[in-house]
Amino acid sequence: MSVYHAAYIDYALRVTENMTDVMTGSETVTLKSYQHFVSRVFLGLDKMHSLLLFHETGVGKTITTVFILKHLKDVYTNWIIILLVKKALVEDPWTYAITKYAPEILKDCIFITYDDKNFHNKFFTNIKTISSRTRLCIIIDECHNFISKSIIKEDGKQRPTKSVYNYLSKNVALHHHKLICLSATPIVNSVKEFVMLVNLLRPKILSNVSLFENKRLVNESELINKLGAICSYIVTNEFSIFDDVAGSSAFARKTVYFQYVNMTQKQEQVYQKAKLAELKAGISSFRIYRRMAATFTFDAFLDKTDKTPEEVANEQITLYKDFETFIKTKKFSEHALSQFKRGQSLGGTSSADDISFLNELRERSCKFTDVCLRILASPGKCLVFEPFVNQSGINILLLYFSAFNISYIEFSSRTKNTRVQSVAEFNKRENTDGDLIKTCVFSLSGGEGISFFSINDIFILDMTWNEASLRQIIGRAIRLNSHVLTPEHRRYVNVHFIVARLSNGDATVDEDLLDIIRTKSKEFTQLFKVFKHTSIEWIYEHQTDFSPVDNESGWSALISRSIDENPTTKRVPHVVKGQNIWYSHSNRLIAVYKGFKTDDGRLFDSDGNFIQTIQDNPVIKIHNDKLVYVLD
């Protein structure tokens, strides 16, 4: 049925044939061809009420959206633009971009922050003041966050944001409004987010039944058939975050490293106490105590049993101040720092004080110590991701930076008033090599809405619960032309996953979280494929045999067809001959997977999903006594 969608895309392009690709305000910008294409389709089809911009970080989805907003009055006279964004993104990029390229629409814009506790009240207060003769254009930036806040909790209680979600899904198409959702990672935590996003864009088209059976999408073709033109898909990096990616003239090369560091005996003892405390408290599934213990340990485990929050807070402050005092009384010699910068260990020519200080730092945190040494040895600027701010997180990490004489900025929840300016200083041309500011340490606050330039090394100190968050974090440093000022031999980004290990070989919390991320990503990859094949770009390129249309009268009926989640066509199992093998997408064997290769060369993963056909004379390497096929 995508051939019919192609006819309407063609119609939109004919209607907007003379639309300029230049946007001028106080400054002028010329849109890239893919930005102009999206804009023409969305503006050329007045009845296209909604569109997802599934664009990877750095390709300019904000500029694309501002261009569309600037040209809304080409379609209709009276518009009010409602931008639903995170508070941190109101000023930059949104107000900044609109003021720069479309200042005339600023008076028609209403910013409402969906991370405000009174968000739903502010939204409906504004809605009541808008004339019924006025059309709305609603922008939802980082829409995965909005969707996440709209999901009903496990206790069945509806979250306030859900009332806004319900209003939009009911009224956008009904009252001839327009909706644009933006995200580089539209699915983050669960498949339910996909269902909710689809039903926001195409109301009631998808029911809440399971889309998967044994981790395989039940009816991919039906979804692709009915969801045609639901999104614009600009994603050049479709690799897993764990895969190496070759560079290009516009993008830096990415290489992934797993840095396994062994906990010290002291750290292991505290880690085991943390594990026991989680079991007693019934919070072992969150792994919070173990995550903190694997990162940093004080001289003793902070047991919260039978203590008031105030007592716990006071004890934490005391432990922190004791460690801070210890750091301030110590200092590495210039000789030691010079060795660290050359990537060398302390040896026979090193002083006893330097060796003792390094051992004491490592005893409390194998991860922080390892990262500091790698930062000093890096030839350029570095990013360090640490999700925890207080306790054993950024608070302590900055003391380690002080000990190793590492210059830094901090982008976290506690630096809201200064962090935007700090990033601007960090990104300055004169700091391309990190001579002025070596490192930016950031929490989850740094995952969205910001860009970093000329980064050479990223250190992931603690895992998030999903690949999407990590992808966004990495994507902030590998963007279109992000390394244009960097010397050619340094146009690369090394991504280091810092993984703590136990001496007895038991899996640590770091290794557990890696497994969780990989399991989730299998289902998400299949849903992202649906978005790709239903995108306006894919349809326009692949569906060329269509009969042109002269109006858009049939568009609404085309996109309103409900999806049959119980198809009559079922998969018929076939028995094939072959063998179990190991395979990897990386020549460096970063991640090795178990699969099945048929006698005719087809490769399937452990869940039965087809991967690719293995060519004659494949590359095979030996890894941990296994023969591993290296895929092209």
Swiss-Prot record:
Membrane spanning stretches: none
Gene symbol of the encoding locus: NPH1
Entry-linked Gene3D superfamilies: P-loop containing nucleotide triphosphate hydrolases
Keyword annotations of the record: ATP-binding, DNA-binding, Hydrolase, Nucleotide-binding, Transcription, Virion
Annotated region described as Binding to the cap-specific mRNA (nucleoside-2'-O-)-methyltransferase, given as residue ranges: 457-524
Domain (Helicase C-terminal) ranges: 367-532
Species per Swiss-Prot/TrEMBL record: Myxoma virus (strain Lausanne) (MYXV)
Compartments where located: Virion
Purpose of the protein: DNA-dependent ATPase required for providing the needed energy to achieve the termination of early transcripts. Acts in concert with the RAP94 subunit of the virion RNA polymerase and the capping enzyme/VTF to catalyze release of UUUUUNU-containing nascent RNA from the elongation complex. NPH-I must bind ssDNA in order to exhibit ATPase activity.
Domain Helicase ATP-binding intervals: 42-204
Binding site for ATP: 55-62
GO biological process: one example: DNA-templated transcription
GO molecular function: ATP binding; DNA binding; ribonucleoside triphosphate phosphatase activity
Known partners and oligomeric status: Monomer. Interacts (via C-terminus) with RAP94 (via N-terminus). Interacts with the cap-specific mRNA (nucleoside-2'-O-)-methyltransferase.
E.C. no: 3.6.1.15
Motif (DEXH box): 141-144
Protein name: Nucleoside triphosphatase I
Catalysed reactions listed for this entry: a ribonucleoside 5'-triphosphate + H2O = a ribonucleoside 5'-diphosphate + phosphate + H(+)
Any single Gene Ontology cellular-component annotation: virion component
Family as reported in the entry's similarity comment: Belongs to the helicase family. NPH I subfamily.
Pfam (any one): SNF2-rel_dom
